[in-house]
Amino acid sequence: MYNWLAKNGYKCAKSYMDKDAFFADVEVGLISYPVFVKPARGSASISISKAYDKETVELLFAHEDGLMIQEFLNGQEIGADVYIDMVSHEIVSIFTKKKLKMRAGETDKAVSFKDKKLFDLIEDFVKKAGYNGQIDIDIFDVNGEYYISEVNPRFGGGYPHAYESGANHMCLIVNNLAGRENECAVGKNYKVGTYMMKYNEIMIQHS
C-alpha cells in the first residue's frame, strides 16, 4: 500500500521491508529516528516497538522474522468510517473522529469532528483506489497535513461512535442489499463534538 500511496502523490509514513535500505536513507537524511518496528502482517498493535537507534533495529530484526520499519508520525491520529455505495459506487457517508486515547490498537476515547479538506482527501483517495462498501481508514494530522496510514475493509472497533452520532451504515448496507441506491450524506449525517469512551466492567456475585 505504501508504494501505491507514494506513487499516487498521497502523504504517508515512509515504510521499509529492507532494513539496509532504511539505514541508507537515514545516512542521507531522508528519515530519522525514532521509528516503529512492527510485523508486516500484524494486528492490535501486537509486537510493535519504538526504536531510537540502529542497534535497537538490528536487535529486533535478529529476534523476529517478517518485520517492517515505519516512519514515526508525530501528530493527531484520526479514524474515518467510510461507506461507498455498492449500487452507485459513490461515497455516501464519512464519519471522522480524533483519537484521544488508544489501547491494544483500538480507540479507547475519541471525539467526532468535521473538516472539508479531510473529506475531499478521503473522497479522492477512495475513488482512485476503487474501494466499495464499508472501510475503516487511519489518518494522521501532522502540522495541518493529512497522512494516510492504513485501510481496513471492515467496520473498525470504534464504529459504535459513528452509529450513535448518526452515521448509520447498517441502514446503508440494508438498502444496497435490497438493490436501493443511497443518497450522499457526507458531512450531514452526524454531530460534531460527540465523545466516545470505552470502559471495563466487573461484576462479582456471591453464592
Task: Map each language-model feature to its residues.
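ATP-dependent carboxylate activation and anion-phosphoryl transfer catalytic cores
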Residues: K114-S207
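Phosphate-binding site of ATP-dependent enzymes
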Residues: S49-G130, F140-D141, E145-Y147
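Active-site nucleotide/adenylate-binding loops and adjacent lid/helix of ATP-dependent enzymes
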Residues: M1-N74, M86-S88, K116-F119
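Predominant activation on well-ordered alpha-helical scaffold segments within soluble catalytic domains
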Residues: Y2, A6, E58, D81, ...
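Broad gene-expression machinery/nucleic-acid interaction feature
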Residues: S32-P34, E77-G79, Q134-D136
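Gly/Ser/Thr-rich helix-start
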Residues: S43, I48, Q76, G157-Y159, ...
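A short, flexible beta-alpha/helix-coil linker loop
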Residues: R41-S43, K101-A104, R154-G157
